[in-house]
C-alpha cells in the first residue's frame, strides 16, 4: 500500500505498530519528529524513516507548515 499522510502544525499521528508489515515514510515537505521503537529522529524534506514490522512508531509535526509524508506499507494492511 502506498499513501500520502499530511499533518498540520502540532498534529500527531499516535504511536502504533503494524504486525507483519514494514512501513516507510519519505518526507516530501515540512519538518517533524518521529519515534520508532526507543529512538527519536528529527526529519525534514528528503528524510526517510523505516518502521520494521511490529515496532511501535509515530510522528509529530514540529514545524510551522504542513508535514507531507509519502508512506508505503508492505505487505499491505488487510
Where are the language model's segments positioned?
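A short glycine-rich, His/Asp/Glu-containing loop-to-beta-strand
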Residues: 1-15, 72, 77
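Short, conserved beta-strand element in jelly-roll/cupin
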Residues: 6-8, 19-34, 72
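Histidine-centered catalytic micro-motifs
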Residues: 14-20, 55
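Conserved catalytic-core motifs of eukaryotic protein kinase domains, centered on the activation segment
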Residues: 18-19, 38, 62
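Ligand-binding loop in jelly-roll beta-barrel domains
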Residues: 33, 53-78
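Short acidic-glycine-tyrosine-enriched beta hairpin
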Residues: 39-53
Amino acid at each position: 500500500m502506498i499513501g500520502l499522510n499530511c499533518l498540520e502544525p502540532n498534529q500527531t499521528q499516535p504511536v502504533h505498530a503494524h504486525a507483519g508489515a514494514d512501513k516507510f515514510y519519505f518526507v516530501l515537505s515540512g519538518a517533524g519528529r518521529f519515534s520508532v521503537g526507543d529512538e527519536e529522529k528529527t526529519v525534514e524534506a528528503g528524510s526517510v524513516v523505516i518502521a520494521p514490522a511490529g515496532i511501535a512508531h509515530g510522528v509529530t509535526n514540529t514545524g510551522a507548515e504542513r508535514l507531507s509524508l509519502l508512506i508505503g506499507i508492505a505487505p499491505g494492511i488487510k
